Amino acid sequence: MTEQTEKDKKQIYNLNKLQKRLRRNVGNAIADFNMIEEGDKVMVCLSGGKDSYTLLDILLNLKFSAPIHFDIVAVNLDQKQPGFPEHVLPQYLESIGVEYKIVEENTYGIVKEKIPEGKTTCSLCSRLRRGILYRTATELGATKIALGHHRDDMLATLFLNMFYGGKLKSMPPKLISDDGKQIVIRPLAYCKEKDIEKYAVAKQFPIIPCNLCGSQPNLQRQVVKEMLNTWDRQYPGRLETMFSAMQNVVPSHLCDPNLFDFKNIRRGQILEGVSGDIAFDKEELPPMPQFADEGESADFSGENLIQFKEVN
């Protein structure tokens, strides 16, 4: 057996292992938050970036092994950015045989007209995109809108809101629009960005850079992202532990009277599920984050195709 053959076999093994991990994470997120139900038509928003390509690929993969039936339609918003390669996404989507729609709206021109040079464009751009995508979902009869935000995006949003907004708030894995007509889901909520990056490279997705956003190097989100990446390198497992904290919120140990009735706490009262004494005693914390090695070295070689948990 040649050295090249051995290398190819290892690459195939690593790709299968990575795909199974992503499938498992997406399947678990879908089940935990009841993201996709029987008969849903899921509109996958495809930007041409690594995240949305991975989202579409994994959902198509899961579609064949899920215990429920659902349909997928891919939608790309062509914002008329100069130099945008309009042929790339249609060619890719036709090659994999998925239903798709390209929506052409000159949001780039609106953003450039309204936002002064040097100012960040993300806020206006995202509002315009959201309105167009909601309208498109209605036109297509889509019951769910799937976005490609992942675990690291959710963590970055948490810190952005703490640092700059004074709120303990992140991206929800599932939300309903203000008018109650659209449900937005984020099936990559449990997926690490570094897994998605590796997967996109291995699958050779035809990535299209966003020149509008990429031209703004001092975005607050980019600064926070670099902070998280530094922590991940220096303290393995920290991001996993922080994400776990987002799923284990204790309102009685925060300071929001809207979430916990501090005013009516009385002597002799016993509160179910609340351990107030921890406020005085130092908690026993593990020397290393509990998720330090999760997923990186796990052996999935014997794992079957991931299936959604049964949803009532």
Swiss-Prot record:
GO molecular function: 4 iron, 4 sulfur cluster binding; ATP binding; magnesium ion binding; sulfurtransferase activity; tRNA binding
Entry superkingdom: Bacteria
Pathway the protein contributes to: tRNA modification
General remark: The thiolation reaction likely consists of two steps: a first activation step by ATP to form an adenylated intermediate of the target base of tRNA, and a second nucleophilic substitution step of the sulfur (S) atom supplied by the hydrosulfide attached to the Fe-S cluster.
The protein's name in its UniProt record: tRNA-cytidine(32) 2-sulfurtransferase
Gene source species: Actinobacillus succinogenes (strain ATCC 55618 / DSM 22257 / CCUG 43843 / 130Z)
Record's GO cellular component terms: cytoplasm
Record text on cofactor binding: Binds 1 [4Fe-4S] cluster per subunit. The cluster is chelated by three Cys residues, the fourth Fe has a free coordination site that may bind a sulfur atom transferred from the persulfide of IscS.
Binding site for [4Fe-4S] cluster: C122, C125, C213
Pfam families from the UniProt entry: ATP_bind_3
Motif, PP-loop motif: chain positions: 47-52
Leading EC class: transferase
Subcellular location: Cytoplasm
Swiss-Prot/TrEMBL cofactor(s): Mg(2+); [4Fe-4S] cluster
Signal peptide: none
Alphabetical list of Gene3D superfamilies matching this protein: HUPs (3.40.50.620)
One GO BP: tRNA thio-modification
Enzyme Commission number(s) of this protein: 2.8.1.-
Main function: Catalyzes the ATP-dependent 2-thiolation of cytidine in position 32 of tRNA, to form 2-thiocytidine (s(2)C32). The sulfur atoms are provided by the cysteine/cysteine desulfurase (IscS) system.
Entry keyword DNA-binding: no
